[in-house]
Regions:
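Short glycine/Trp-rich loop-beta-loop segment that forms part of the substrate-binding cleft
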Residues: 78, 112-136, 294
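Active-site loop architecture of trypsin-fold serine endopeptidases
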Residues: 47, 67-70, 103-106, 126-143, ...
Length: 407
């Protein structure tokens, strides 16, 4: 029985019957907590969960940081050594293996189906908030609902939102459904006023995303796995209250997007049968694929729908060929000092003396040193091979729109 039924019971059939429902609900909840506790893992001041009887466990990448080996303790009190199997720094996920004696198994919670979650479903978060488990040797359980699915929150691009209370120390712990299955790994909270404590919004990496990455994590030999992206295409998003869509604005020749058959003007309808309603959803879906994945894009072209299959590859950093002038004080935006001959910047039409006023459709409205610093960092860290990068430059008294194809 569910908590919702007990609440409805109080309204419809009287206090006595509602009390019976509530008692059943409490028993169900207690049984789930009893089942989940032994599979919980205390690790590095944070949380984790065993998902297989052979001792494979999950936590957040930010919990393990750059360490390779750990002393961990299960919720049943037993302690083990654990070593990192694989890391996904972008997706904030890590897999570790407990060092078990030959033939020994440990309690575990299986992965569930996060795609079956509905807004309003009950959810339970298990964790070690504020390291309280150090005091009483037991994890804590908080109960809430699924507040949203397919949400984008920073690097969590397809996450689950819950109002089950999460606090520092809950990171890496499981979000479980009423069947006692792991539907997510908790990892972020929404904070206010600089206070790192629960505000009613917690974010979990979905079991769907975990299932996509688990085989790669197990094969990583302690290393890091890479995310993929669709290269050679520029999307344009119209996210408004009444109309939302994602269209292809430009496709670069000779790229994987061009080989897949994308055309300017295509509207993205779905990616691998997952509906794309807006730009956030499109970016979220594309953000969870591993390197080398193939994805089916359903696009609307004219009056018909066409399915395109594209290969997604890991980003490769590149040099744009742009050198910036040093800041000289005053209210200066980034100024191009030199353009490398034969570079992507020269092909795009950039010239010495150009003032960068917009990057990827956004005006550089910052104080002078901040604008230059942020733009310089973006040049070095966010532009990859086959990216189409819109730039607006001021040349004399005229603003010029340029498109840089990174090579």
């Amino acid at each position: 029985m569910t908590f919702l039924r007990s609440r409805l019971g109080a309204a419809m059939i009287g206090v006595g019957a509602a009390a019976a429902f509530a008692a059943d609900d409490s028993a169900d909840l207690a049984a789930i907590c009893v089942k989940a506790r032994p599979a919980f893992v205390f690790i590095a001041g944070g949380s984790g969960v065993v998902i297989r009887p052979d001792g494979l466990m999950l936590t957040n990448d930010h919990v393990i940081e750059n360490r390779r080996r750990f002393d961990v303790r299960l919720g049943d009190g037993r302690s083990f050594k654990a070593k990192v199997v694989g890391r996904d720094a972008v997706g904030d996920l890590a897999a570790l293996q407990l060092d078990l004696p030959a033939g020994e198994t440990v309690p575990h919670l299986p992965l569930g189906d996060s795609e079956a979650l509905r807004v309003g479903d009950e959810a339970i978060a298990v964790g070690n908030p504020f390291a309280l488990g150090v005091l009483d040797q037991a994890p804590t359980f908080t109960v809430g609902i699924i507040s949203a699915v397919h949400h984008t929150q920073g690097s969590y691009t397809e996450c689950i939102v819950t109002d089950a209370e999460l606090n520092p120390g809950n990171s890496g712990g499981p979000l479980i459904n009423m069947a006692g299955e792991v539907v997510g790994i908790n990892g972020q909270i929404s904070t206010r006023y600089g206070l790192r404590s629960n505000t009613g919004l917690g974010f979990a990496i979905s079991a769907r995303q975990i299932a996509m990455w688990l085989p790669l994590l197990e094969q990583a030999a302690g290393g890091e796995v890479k995310h993929a992206r669709l290269t050679g295409v520029e999307f344009e998003s119209r996210d408004r209250e009444t109309v939302a869509s994602v269209t292809v604005k430009d496709v670069a020749e000779g790229t994987l997007a061009a080989e897949a058959g994308f055309r300017a003007g295509d509207t993205i309808v779905a990616i691998d049968d997952a509906p794309v309603a807006n730009g956030h959803r499109c970016a979220g879906l594309l953000g969870i694929y591993p390197e080398g994945s193939r994805a089916a894009f359903r696009v609307r072209r004219g009056g018909e729908e066409v399915t395109l299959e594209a290969v997604l590859t890991a980003p490769q950093r590149c040099r744009t060929g742009i050198d910036l002038e040093r800041p000289r004080g005053g209210d200066l935006l980034p100024v191009v000092e030199a353009v490398e001959p034969g570079s992507s910047a020269e092909v795009a039409g950039l010239k010495p003396g150009d003032v960068i006023v917009a990057f990827r459709g956004r005006r550089l409205e910052f104080p002078a040193r901040d604008a230059r610093k942020l733009f310089d960092r973006a040049l070095r860290t966010t532009i990859n091979v086959d990216d189409i990068v819109p730039l607006t430059v001021r040349r004399g008294t005229t603003e010029v729109e340029l498109r840089l194809l990174a090579k």
